[in-house]
Amino acid sequence: MSKIRIALLQLLSAGYDQLANQAKGMQYCRMAKQLGADIALFPEMWNIGYKLPDSALPDQVEYWQEHAIDRDSDFVNAFRKLAWDLDLAIGLTYLERWEAGPRDTLSLIDRHGEIRLTYAKVHTCDFDREINLTPGEYFYVSELDTAAGPLKVGAMICFDREFPESARILMLKGAELILTPNACELEANRIGQFRARAFENMLVVAMANYAIPQENGRSAAFDGIAFKETGSRDTCLVQADGHEGIYLAEFDLDLLRAYRLSEGWGNAYRKPERYGLLTSRSVEPPFVRRDARR
C-alpha cells in the first residue's frame, strides 16, 4: 500500500496552560492513530495556543518569553515518546526559546520518536505582534520513514504559504509533502492560494488551523494532481468546517510520484537564469513598509 494518511488536528487551545495543551494534544494524537493516521499535524504554536504579546507592554513581552521552550524540553520529549509508543509521526509546534528572541517553530518527529527536522517560520507577520518573533533563516526537507516507505517532507508556517517562494524552495529540495501549521482566518482567497501551491509544485500540502472561535477552522489538504487521463480533477483531499476535530487527508504516494514524472510543472520547465530579480533586496513603492524586516 502506498496510501498515506495525515490527521489535521483542528483544535482549541488552553492558551498559556502548556500542561493542558500537552495533555489534549496527546489525547488527539492517540485518536488520530486509532483513525489510521501516519502523520498528525498541530496548528501553529500549539504549546501556548498562538499567544503573542503587545510590543508596547514590556511585562507582557517578558511573560510571553518565559513560555518559550527548548527542543529538548519536557513538552517536546513527551511527544517524542508518544510518537514512538504510537508508531505515529507528529508535526509538533511550539514557541521555541532562542537567543535573539523566541521563534515560531515546528519539529517533525518520526514514528520512532526522532526529530527529523526543526523549522522556524521565515515570513513573520512584522506588521503585527509577530514582530516579537525571531524569523527563521532556512527551509528544510527531510526523509520521513512511513509504513508506505520513505517520504520527503518539508514545512512552512502560516504566512509562509502566502509567498510562492516558500513552497518552491521546498519543491526544489525534493519535498513531496509540505506540512503547514496555521493560526489565522482561512477564507476563499487564502485557501485558493494554498491550493495553487500544490498545483504549481506537484506535491501535497496539508494545513491545520485552530477551530472556531479561536480561528475559523477550515483546515485543508490538496494533492497537486490536477489532471488524470480523462481530464481535470479536484485536488482537494479534505476541507474542514469550523468545528474542533480531526480531519483526515489521504493520498496515494505512488500516484503522486507517477504524476510528477510526466507533467510540466514543478522544476520541469523552469528558467532560473531569468529569475535573478527575485533575490534582489530592493523594495520600491507601493511595497515599501517601514516595519518590514529583510
Question: What are these model-derived regions, one by one?
Answer:
Residues 68-90, 161-248, 256:
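CN hydrolase (nitrilase-like) catalytic-core segments centered on the catalytic cysteine
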Residues 1-8:
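Extreme N-terminal starter segment of soluble prokaryotic enzymes
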Residues 18, 23-112, 184-201:
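Cys-nucleophile CN-hydrolase/nitrilase-fold catalytic domain and related Cys-dependent amidase chemistry
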Residues 251-294:
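A short C-terminal boundary segment appended to hydrolase-like catalytic domains
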Residues 81, 97-173, 182, 186-196, ...:
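Active-site catalytic loop in hydrolytic enzyme cores
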Residues 10-16:
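Short polar catalytic/cofactor-binding loops
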